[in-house]
Structure formats: C-alpha cells, structure tokens
UniProtKB/Swiss-Prot annotation:
One of its GO terms (biological process) is cellulose catabolic process. It catalyses: Hydrolysis of (1->4)-beta-D-glucosidic linkages in cellulose and cellotetraose, releasing cellobiose from the non-reducing ends of the chains. The lineage of its organism: Eukaryota, Fungi, Dikarya, Ascomycota, Pezizomycotina. PANTHER family: 1,4-BETA-D-GLUCAN CELLOBIOHYDROLASE A-RELATED (PTHR33753:SF6), 1,4-BETA-D-GLUCAN CELLOBIOHYDROLASE B (PTHR33753). GO terms for molecular function: cellulose 1,4-beta-cellobiosidase activity. GO terms for cellular component: extracellular region. It is an enzyme of class 3 (hydrolase). Residues 1-17 form the signal peptide. The active site is at E226, E231. This is Probable 1,4-beta-D-glucan cellobiohydrolase A. Glycans are attached at N81, N284. It comes from the Eukaryota.
Length: 452
C-alpha cells in the first residue's frame, strides 16, 4: 500500500514472550466466503476476521496499567524492547463497540471513527489460530464493495501481504499471541509504526507522531511483498503490485527500512511505490467515480485475475487483469490514454513504459518487477482495512501529487480531490461516519467467480 497511516505487528522473543491478556476473551466475527472450481461452481467457506494487534489494548501482565497510551510508551513497563515484550500483553477486542467492525454472512463493514478509535485492519482467518493463505497465481479474486461512503482522503483497502499464516508463532515460539490476536503484519512500506516486530517491542528509538495522536515510528520495520488489489474511495481506485527482495517477512532497522516512515524512501529491500494502475492517472477521467462508467454511488463487483506465462498455478506471473461487474454488466478495465503506454492491465511492458512516461524511478524493476511479485503470490494473507493518511493525505490516490508538480504533466493527476480535502484532522472531524463494506468474496480459477 502506497502510504498507510495505521500499522502494526506483535510477536515474541525467546524467553521474553509477548503475552496474552485475560481481561477480555477474543471472539472473531464470522465471515463466509466462496471457493470456486473451474466449472464455475462455488462452495461456501466458514471463515472469520481478526483485528490487527496494533489496534489492541496493550497492558501490564499484572494488572490493567497501560503499556502504551496515545502515541507514547510506559517507560517503567517498556524501558527496552525485550522488557516490554515480557511485561505487556495484548487483549481481546470488542469489534463493534470499540472498532466499528461488524459482519453479517459474507458482509464485512468497517466504520471509520468509533469513539476514540480511527480506522481498522482485519485479516481473514482459516480457523481461530491461523490466517487463510491464498495462492493467487493462475487464479482470480472477486469481491463486492460499496465505496459510496468513502470521501476524499479515505482508503477502503483490500489487499494481500506475505505474512506467516500463524502470525509468526513458529518462528518465535514464545509468541503467545499469534494469528489469533492479529500478529505478524508486514508490507512493502516496511512499516515502523508497529508496536511489536519479530517478538520484540519496537519501543527503542520510538518517536511519537507530530500529527497522529495514536501512532509513532520505532527503530524497526516489518517488510514483505504486498499485492494491493484495491485501494479506493468514491473518487479514485488503484491496483498495485509491490515486490520485495525477500518473498517472506523480514525485519529492517532504522532508515535502512525505506518507505513512508524513513528518511530515504528507496533505501530498503521493498518497492514502496509499486506499479499502479489508476484509471484517472492513466488518462481516463470518466471511467471511475460518482455517475461515471463504474459508478461509485452503487455497489460493484471487482474481479482481479493473475495470469501466468504457462497457465499453471506455479508459473511465472505475466499479467494482472482487472474487470468490473455492475448492474449485471461486465465492464472491462479502462485503457491507458497516456502516450507510449498501452493496454488496460499490468504487465512488465506496461510497468516499464509507465515509469518512463511519468518520469518515475523504476524501483519496481529494481526489486524484481512482476516476476518478483509472482514469486510471493503462493502464500498470501487477505487484509481489509479503512484508513486515513497522516503522511500525504491520500493525495497519491485521489488528488494531484506531488503537490508541487505541474498537474498537466503525465502521472501527476490521480483524482479530482482538492489539496487539503484529505487532511486527516479534517476527514476525522467532518466524516467520522464514513465506512466501507466488502462482501461476497470469491476465489478460484480464471473465469470461475463471475458471470461473463
């Protein structure tokens, strides 16, 4: 994900476990989804969702004293990373009451502001202790989404990252929390706002955010490949692969992490920019939005296909295709209107041409490009989230960005939102009731999840 305001992880060090609290039982909201076959028949799967550990109450193992309040650590309980992991526990979640997360059948609704809480990030579970893993290669992933209540500056995201299915418990055996409590997060920004990474707290070097009352930046980050199927609001949308040098989660240190949270964006082992297909950025301003061809005032079905060179589930990723279904009509993705950039799907040729046309540094190719992304797609965890952006106010998605660039230059205009419209303070005060609803998740071979 290009920039992410709210992030996390939690695991444990040998002999210094991150603990599990006993103040509230953890009950995962149920969520059904469908697994389809080549013949187009689908069977219902009984899953559930879990909220990321970074959102959870973190308190002393001995009582209810907070280990973390606002965006600062309790220095007595957390003088260093190892002591903090030993002294502190994450606890169960009140999904609806605290986080504004509700499910019904196949439907998941994420509310933006609930009390003091802002945003959320949920993972699809296979069972109570394990994230659901997906092999996207030679398959397609389909879901319905309602973005009508997502104004400028918000992002209702559905994406995959190469997290460990157990949240890291087997790699760090003293991790007592694991996937059940939403541990193990990583992405291509190598996020440093995570309170726990690889079994240790992230308190050493922690700097509270100057503009986010709930977040800060620590000394470590958590990196892994990320496949952004859907980053969107009612104005703009983007699909973006982000490869990394390693196909699984790794920990980084300081500004060597790169990404949004570091002084040098391209210093790390991942591609923080990715190769994005945003119809508006690719020159088609009438395709996606309120009253447009894909009308964001109504629910839509989003289909994403992962084509391999040899047509097998183990082949090299060669193309990522997108289409929509709305009001019973299949809508092909918009075609690029940018000079010297052709097509309506993501391929190696498209990415190379797009970077050149936009004058962007080709960090995508540096970290393996499309084939590198494909190497990570066999074991991916599904994430659904709602968030605002304390780094760049989501202008990279729905406005003109960089802010000092000429809007008429190719690649600068990404949507119709005005500068400042997505300022987190503004959207949190003016649109606390914003929300996104995902439903009818389907997964299976190419062509099996929708009616042509």
């Amino acid at each position: 994900m290009h920039q992410r305001a709210l992030l996390f992880s939690a695991l444990a060090v040998a002999a210094n476990a991150q603990q599990v609290g006993t103040q509230k039982p953890e009950t995962h909201p149920p969520l059904t989804w469908q697994k389809c076959t080549a013949a187009g028949s689908c069977s219902q799967q009984s899953g559930s969702v879990v909220i990321d550990a970074n959102w959870r109450w973190l308190h002393s193992t001995k009582d209810t004293t907070n280990c973390y309040t606002g965006n600062t650590w309790n220095t007595e309980l957390c003088p260093d990373n190892e002591s903090c992991a030993q002294n502190c526990a994450v606890d169960g979640a009140d999904y609806a009451g605290t986080y504004g997360v509700t499910t019904s059948g196949s439907e998941l609704k994420l509310s933006f502001v609930t009390g003091a809480n802002v945003g959320s990030r949920l993972y699809l579970m296979q069972d109570d202790e394990t994230y659901q893993h997906f092999n996207l290669l030679n398959n397609e992933f389909t879901f319905d989404v309602d973005v009508s209540n997502l104004p400028c500056g918000l992002n209702g995201a559905l994406y995959f990252v190469a997290m460990d299915a157990d949240g890291g418990m087997s790699k760090y055996p003293s991790n007592k929390a694991g996937a059940k409590y939403g541990t193990g997060y990583c992405d291509s920004q190598c996020p440093r706002d995570l309170k726990f990474i690889n079994g240790m707290a992230n308190v050493e070097g922690w700097k509270p955010s100057s503009n986010d009352k709930n977040a800060g930046v620590g000394g470590h980050g958590s990196c892994c490949p990320e496949m952004d199927i859907w980053e969107a609001n009612s104005i703009s949308t983007a699909v973006t692969p982000h490869p990394c040098d390693d196909v699984s989660q790794t920990m980084c240190s300081g500004d060597a992490c790169g990404g949004t949270y570091s002084a040098t964006r391209y210093a790390g082992t991942c591609d923080p920019d990715g190769c994005d297909f945003n119809p508006f950025r690719m020159g088609n301003e009438s395709f996606y939005g309120p009253g447009k061809i894909v009308d964001t005032k109504s629910e839509m079905t989003v289909v994403t296909q992962f084509i391999t060179a040899d047509g097998t589930d183990t082949g090299a990723l060669s193309e990522i295709k997108r289409l929509y279904v709305q009001n019973g009509k299949v809508i092909a993705n918009s075609v690029s209107n940018v000079a010297d950039v052709s097509g309506n799907s993501i391929s190696s040729d498209f990415c190379t041409a797009q970077k050149k046309a936009f004058g962007d540094e080709d960090i995508f190719a540096k970290h393996g490009g499309l084939s590198g992304m494909g190497k990570a797609l066999s074991e991916m965890v599904l994430i659904m989230s709602i968030w605002d952006d304390h780094h760049s106010s989501m202008m990279w998605l729905d406005s003109t960005y960089p802010t000092d660039a000429d809007p008429s230059k190719p690649g600068v205009a990404r949507g119709t939102c005005e500068h400042g419209a997505g300022d987190p303070e503004k959207v949190e005060s003016q649109h606390p009731d914003a929300s996104v609803t995902f439903s009818n998740i389907k997964f299976g071979p190419i062509g099996s999840t929708y009616k042509a």
